Amino acid sequence: MKKYIILASIATAFIFGLSSCSDFLDELPDNRTELTPDNVSKILLAAYPTTAICEMAEMASDNTDAYPNNFSAFNRLQEDLYKWEDSSEREDDSPSALWESCYIAIAACNQALKVVEDAGSPASLDPVKGEALVCRAYAHFQLANIFCKAYSSATAKTDLGIPYMKDVETTVLPSYDRGTLEDVYKNIEADLLAGMDLIRDDVYSVPKYHFTRKAAYAFAARFYLYYVQPDLSNYDEVIRFADRVLGNNASAVVRDWESLGALDLNGDVAPNAYVDASNSANLLLVSAHSYWGYVHAPYGLGERYAHGPLAAMETCRSSGLWGDYSSNKAASVYYLYPWSNSSALPTKVILQKVAQYKEMVDPVAGTINGHIINAAFTTDETLLCRAEAYIMKGPGFYQQAIADLNVWQSAFTRSTTPLTVEAIDTYYGNMPYYTLPAPTVKKELHPAFTIADRTQENLIHCLLHARRVMTLHEGLRWLDIKRFGIVIYRRYITSSGMFGASDVLATCLLYTSPSPRDMRRSR
């Protein structure tokens, strides 16, 4: 029986060159685990990136404003992320940490696949192979979403990609070809399709922390939503995979937002319930090294750049066809009621979805490692993926889109008035586009794909509005900004709580994060 050596530190050494050769050799004896076909599944515990996109994506998006400088940033990283600056910070939640953790996860996948291949790919190892392939696709997808432009069939063959690693590395400090975005998406698709049906849910002790079949199908639905083809065939794939997740009655599998909203706003009661592994709405939960639970949450931290009252008027305090926000919790249209600090100049208005978990490092010094649990895929988000696909397929599918939006509305809001194509077209058609003097939830769209007419655009505005509110604090708004070429601003709030200066960020080329400096030597 063949045995293989995986080194927990070697992936970082390959990719970043952060350690010298002598440091690497010094660590070699203490960081090795023998892998065999019998225990190879254990390495897949390391196949999920341990850095979430939440902070970097939320800080970069229009969900965040800058407050007066008498408030402090949580750290230099938070300031860099808000200002879209090329950050040299390497701590948790940074682009560098995401890059590193994704490639470490990919290295674990490749090690597992090598063991399976050299064992002759027996059927008994199909679940390992399936999970490894889907995890490899997911880690590359996360990297592409942050470090590349949004996919466009017109430019993807020349747009810069990220290195797609398929092999176990055998050399230190190799040079990688970043290739094109087209290459990346084709490889993601190949891995995802090859792996998803090999997955077996019954091999997991805690399935929600692994790619189950439904989680893989939800990933496929989101992937194909982003992978827009000239003939729109990708939307058929979104619908096909979303159907596998949602079944014949989507309203039976989405989250019970009313029950969640009834929980205490104080403490971690609601955030813990949101990421409860027993909740059928949660398809994949990922534990991450992060301080996002401090930065965005009900603490006097990170208030210089925050989701405050003005931003909330476009999100969790926004009005819609479904009704109006009210400061009276029982009368507010949304079941999930926001927490707000009560200072003279409130800086934080948040939905209680992200708890900060603490791992004590030094009790005497009081130092900790921070962690969060991220609901990476949920039935609710998959529902809105399908609704968007129906909208983009055109008028013959608008009623299916409306049906999905009504499922969302019934679950997330108190509204009992069904949405219709006509009502949405009128409501968003009459709404002016966002301007700084008069902000609205309707912002100009400049996607690489074609929006057919006013009605389709207004349905998209409704869909984007719903997703922005529902996924607040989770980073998905930034991906919508990139995909739809949405013009956003860096707004500076004065001590009176009103808009002061602003910077417009309208160039789609800006909607990428620079790769970590350690990887700029990639070809």
Please name every model-derived segment.
Residues 146-187, 231-236, 240:
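Short coil/linker segments at helix-helix boundaries
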Residues 235-380, 415-450, 460-462, 470-471, ...:
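Hydrophobic-face positions in mid-chain alpha helices that act as interaction patches
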